[in-house]
Design a protein with these regions (language model features):
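N-terminal glycine-/serine-/threonine-rich beta1-alpha1-beta2 phosphate-ribose binding loop
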Residues: 1-64
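Short, surface-exposed amphipathic charged segments that create phosphate/polyanion-binding patches used
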Residues: 9-14, 110-113, 174
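A generic structural signal for short
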Residues: 46-48, 72-73, 136-137, 164
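Rossmann-fold NAD(P)-binding glycine/threonine-rich loop
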Residues: 50-65, 72-114
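Hydrophobic residues within beta-strands of alpha/beta enzymes
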Residues: 69-70, 124
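Rossmann-like NAD(P)H-binding beta-loop-alpha module
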Residues: 89-92, 96-155, 169, 177
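Substrate-binding/catalytic subdomain of NAD(P)-dependent oxidoreductase enzymes
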Residues: 138-139, 147-212
């Protein structure tokens, strides 16, 4: 089982891995929720660097308990976007997700500044997938497509499951996030996509995908 540690005093980063193994308790979503809310630390911020839908499901509860959320995780920003933004505004806390698009470049913040100054965003042009950009730059007569996918994962360009990138899901998530921040009411189903990988490659498990 996954381990977790909680402390109001913080941790010594020089040996936190050893401490986690020795003193960490078995972790669950309920444990994480209860420990963080129970600490009741003023002006606290929950930072999510995972790609977990389960962790993203905790945001609403945290925001309702006056805990700000900063997320690299894209899932909540396209699934429960309006609800979380509304709760954060009502509770006077922050729900921020700048790294969802552009790897931390101030794209979302810039859009917010433009909108708040009265501008209307009409068009955005961007390369939104570092993974696909990497793959298309690497593929050649000497390096087959399958190898470039593996290279992208080894170099940590891709999502843990590269099919999320290849299916266009990651790009669609980013497009929806940007459109919503620009003031448009958009859902994933509104985005047109043209796949360059056959649909049957997305069926089955991740292990099945790598065997093809």
């Amino acid at each position: 089982a996954a381990k977790a540690m909680f402390s109001r005093e913080g941790f010594d980063l020089a040996n936190f891995r050893e401490e986690l193994l020795e003193k960490g308790k078995d972790s669950s979503l309920q444990t994480i929720r209860d420990e963080i809310i129970g600490m009741n630390i003023f002006n606290s911020v929950f930072v999510d660097c995972t790609a977990s839908a389960d962790i993203a499901s905790l945001y609403k509860d945290f925001l309702q308990h006056n805990i700000s959320v900063v997320a690299a995780n894209k899932i909540a920003a396209y699934e429960t976007y309006r609800e979380l933004k509304t709760i954060a505004r009502q509770r006077g806390v922050k729900y921020l997700f700048e790294t969802n698009v552009g790897a931390g470049l101030p794209i979302i913040n810039t859009i917010n500044d433009l909108i708040h100054s009265g501008d209307k965003i009409l068009k955005i042009e961007a390369v939104l997938s570092g993974t696909l950009n990497y793959i298309f730059n690497k593929i050649s007569a000497d390096i087959p497509f399958s190898r470039t996918i593996k290279m992208a994962q080894e170099e940590r360009y891709s999502e843990p499951d590269p099919r999320i990138d290849l299916s266009g899901k990651d790009v669609i998530r980013k497009l929806v996030i940007l459109a919503r921040e620009a003031g448009y009411k958009l859902e994933q189903e509104d985005v047109e996509k043209n796949l360059f990988v056959p649909n049957d490659f997305f069926e089955g498990s991740l292990d099945d995908f790598w065997k093809r």
